[in-house]
Amino acid sequence: MQLLLALLALAYVAPSTEDSGWCYEIQTKDPRSSCLGPEKWPGACKENQQSPINIVTARTKVNPRLTPFILVGYDQKQQWPIKNNQHTVEMTLGGGACIIGGDLPARYEAVQLHLHWSNGNDNGSEHSIDGRHFAMEMHIVHKKLTSSKEDSKDKFAVLAFMIEVGDKVNKGFQPLVEALPSISKPHSTSTVRESSLQDMLPPSTKMYTYFRYNGSLTTPNCDETVIWTVYKQPIKIHKNQFLEFSKNLYYDEDQKLNMKDNVRPLQPLGKRQVFKSHAPGQLLSLPLPTLLVPTLTCLVANFLQ
């Protein structure tokens, strides 16, 4: 009985900040943690078409089919739900926003947005371009509207944007930044004041050039089901906006481990080819009524899920 009580007492005074699930390298260094770092991630994480990668621009090939995207519903203003999912800040998207074109095999509906960051200006992005990392990286995750086992390799289309620190406040990011203090603890939720996805993107003239490759989710189970679009031109946000992420968000309930370095290490490119856009045309960001048919397709697919 005394031994049992001693073990219970030990368990009480030394709680784990994580369950036995996956986590980032910085979390494994916490003596209270028992989670699995990137080297031990399960699922497909050891396969050979993983993400993120370093993009060597001199080795990319132009694909003339990589034209600018048509962004349907990206201009809709909504109050977006957000949460601290214990790994990042995640914004749930909906309402029929989707992307068309860019040599994608179908229409893809926007389902969520999340970010990766550090507290330094050059080590917070997951992808790197010619060996250069950025302060942050934003992923807008889209799901294929019609999907089957036969085409599972293109189940998701992710738009990845590098983010660097500048000297001007990015008004498009400000609604999200203002909401961060309300989701400090893991699993906490809140709502971003009315804004649009378009507000967070670079000007259309900065979205002509992007890179394309087939890869994986960058978190377990690391399924190799992603068509990656990585934009060359970074988004700029003010230093104070950037620092709000690591300042306000925490990995643990006790709020002792600030959320930062939520970045998977680079993965080997292997035999894959990275392509780049020719993109001579204009990016089309259209209001919902302008493209009625694709928009209704997005909405109906969302309703039927």
Curated annotation (Swiss-Prot):
It is an enzyme of class 4 (lyase). It comes from the Eukaryota. Its cofactor is Zn(2+). CDD domains: alpha_CA_IV_XV_like. Catalyzes the reversible hydration of carbon dioxide into bicarbonate and protons and thus is essential to maintaining intracellular and extracellular pH. May stimulate the sodium/bicarbonate transporter activity of SLC4A4 that acts in pH homeostasis. It is essential for acid overload removal from the retina and retina epithelium, and acid release in the choriocapillaris in the choroid. Interacts with SLC4A4. This is Carbonic anhydrase 4. It comes from Mus musculus. The gene is Ca4.
